[in-house]
Design a protein with these regions (language model features):
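Short runs of predominantly hydrophobic/aromatic residues within well-ordered alpha helices
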Residues: 7-12, 45, 71, 100, ...
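Right-hand nucleic-acid polymerase module
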Residues: 13, 107-110, 163-164, 180-327
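Conserved polymerase palm-domain catalytic core
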Residues: 51-149, 154-170, 181, 187, ...
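Short, conserved non-catalytic motifs in the polymerase core
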Residues: 1-13, 27-40, 106-126
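Active-site-proximal segment of RNA-dependent polymerases
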Residues: 16-68, 72-76
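Beta-rich nucleic-acid/ligand-interaction surfaces
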Residues: 34-43, 153-156, 188-192
């Protein structure tokens, strides 16, 4: 898969900011988290915690089931004809000059699937499954659904319900010339859920705990071992180590990881001879309450007939939708 030339990226960046973003994102559901202003990994993690806690409160226990899906080679498998048909219909509906559509088609047809170097690829990929999102949330009534690009989950009361849903999802994917990969599975909610680098699980009291996955911990372990040898040998600078660790610490702070981050901050401090401190813990419980408060206020205004949009009380900092920054 090829990355676009620099000039192509500049053109697409301008097109995305001035035309494409508002055209495409208007219809997205709340639980479509990637590549959008005010969204990102933190928003998805906080939203998952809210879903799990809300499920426990409504059902009185963690006796539920999870369907976890992942689309196989998503970007590389996106069908150009289907994508362009969706984009054309959307632009016509929004009254966008079709010259922009013609320009987009030139870039789309440059490679198979969607090239990872295009800024617009993220939005086009989200749009490709937008109709699917609405089907899951509205037609199937799946309250506890979340998607981050090609990775999504559904929480339901029974395994049978999710088995039927999975058959529908497979038909949807087939119609889009996509397929789910082997990681797709149905399992008890009590087992917890791996999503975006964190393992989220419910305690007996109904609290949701979010820890870094073992694979993510192994990444920082490997990196620290490398620094222990490379820094004294002059193969890596102090500034590079600090930059890399701070990026990892920022990501890890999305979960309940303060003790873990403090442990590795001390290791890094010993290596470089400078006191490194982890970020303060993010109060995601407060974030969940803020999201709930926004929803309650929206319901009150809706009952009063006041549908004037209001800025959310909770706006997490967006993160780049790319490879983790410490890689």
């Amino acid at each position: 898969m090829q990355a676009p030339a620099f000039v192509d990226k500049v053109v697409l960046h301008a097109l995305t900011d001035n035309v494409l973003y508002d055209t495409i994102c208007t219809s997205f559901i709340r639980d479509n988290h990637a590549s959008r202003r005010g969204k990102g990994t933190l928003d998805a993690i906080v939203r998952l915690k809210g879903h799990m806690v809300d499920y426990y409160r409504k059902n009185g226990s963690a006796d539920g089931w999870v369907l976890k899906c992942d689309v196989h080679h998503f970007f590389a498998s996106i069908d150009h004809d289907i994508l362009k048909a969706k984009l054309r219909a959307l632009m016509q509906k929004r009254g966008v000059d079709m010259a922009f559509y013609d320009l987009m088609c030139i870039y789309i047809d440059k490679t198979d699937g969607l090239p990872l170097g295009y800024q617009t690829s993220q939005l086009l990929a989200l749009m490709f499954l937008d109709e699917f999102d609405h089907y899951i949330k509205e037609d199937r009534g799946c309250r506890y659904y979340g998607r981050y690009m090609d990775d999504f989950y559904v929480i339901a009361r029974t395994k049978r319900e999710l088995q039927f849903l999975l058959k529908d999802i497979e038909r949807w994917m087939s119609d889009l010339h996509l397929e789910l990969n082997s990681k797709t599975a149905i399992f008890p909610l009590k087992n917890g859920l791996d999503f975006l680098g964190f393992h989220s699980y419910l305690t007996e009291s109904g609290a949701c705990v979010q820890k870094l996955r073992r694979s993510e911990i192994q990444r920082i372990q490997t990196r620290v071992k490398y620094w222990e040898k490379a820094y004294p040998a002059g193969e890596v600078t102090r500034e590079a180590i600090i930059t890399s660790f701070v990026a990892w610490d920022a990501f890890a702070s999305y979960g309940d990881t303060y003790a873990l981050r403090l442990k590795y901050a001390k290791k890094v401090s010993v290596i470089i001879g400078v006191d490194v401190k982890p970020r303060r813990k993010i109060n995601s419980t407060r974030s969940v309450r803020a999201l709930r408060r926004v929803k309650q206020e929206q319901n009150i205004r809706r009952k009063r007939g006041d549908i004037t949009p209001r800025k959310d009380l909770f706006q997490p900092e967006p993160r780049p939708d790319s490879i983790p920054p410490w890689m």
